[in-house]
């Protein structure tokens, strides 16, 4: 799942990425990051790129590509742009957006819209079983309940949150609520086992509890990610059984002793 942004090369960027992934045999779900930061013309072009690619992916029968309607974050997207994205979103896909990654995102939403971020997304029709929210650091229990009610997905990006000094999300509570949660990177690393390790120690440190995260982190990586992908691809993923997709990686194992 890639949330791409390159504001000097919007048109056809998702198609270029998908072709490279195809050459490598990698299954991909792509979207372009819509934002008002570079003006309305660029925002509109971003919406159109998402729509074009999503329709192309929906018509493809290889089960190797999928598309979403990508958005940057609440504080960089006006109601006008939200409405434009919703009007051009094909049926059968959802949104991919950063949510409450920084406290500024929450403050902006409260000041300009008089509501918290998840409430705004709910009112704009963004939430749902096909929508993926990144981060969710500054959300409260009421917002978690909305995510559960709408069956919206969440992805935790521990190294990105630490590197950007954003804070630690209430991921253990989110998982406890039964919200489908995956483990990601936000582009900070390409090593998922490193993300696994960092997520494990981050929540132990943050909660001052050495028993925290032992079950939740492997659940996110080995079960949550496959279930998230399963909402966009037809074949069974994340399992070793007859008929399932053979999405297998083989890693070197360095023995601790000679």
Question: Which functions belong to the PLM regions below?
Answer:
Residues 1-7:
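Hydrophobic alpha-helical hairpins/lids featuring a short glycine-rich hinge
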Residues 140-142, 146-184:
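A conserved active-site cap/scaffold subdomain adjacent to cofactor or substrate pockets
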Residues 34-35, 101, 158-163, 186-188:
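Short, acidic/turn-prone active-site loops that include or flank metal/cofactor-
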Residues 19, 83, 119, 144-145, ...:
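Alpha-helical segments flanking ligand/cofactor-binding loops in enzyme cores
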Residues 21, 69, 98, 133, ...:
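Divalent metal-coordination and catalytic microenvironments
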Residues 7-137:
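Metal-coordinating catalytic core of metallo-dependent amide/deamination hydrolases
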Residues 123-126, 130, 172-255:
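His/Asp/Glu-enriched, well-ordered alpha-helical/loop segment
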Residues 25-27, 88-94, 126-129, 146-155, ...:
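Glycine-enriched alpha-helix->loop->beta-strand junction motifs that scaffold or abut catalytic
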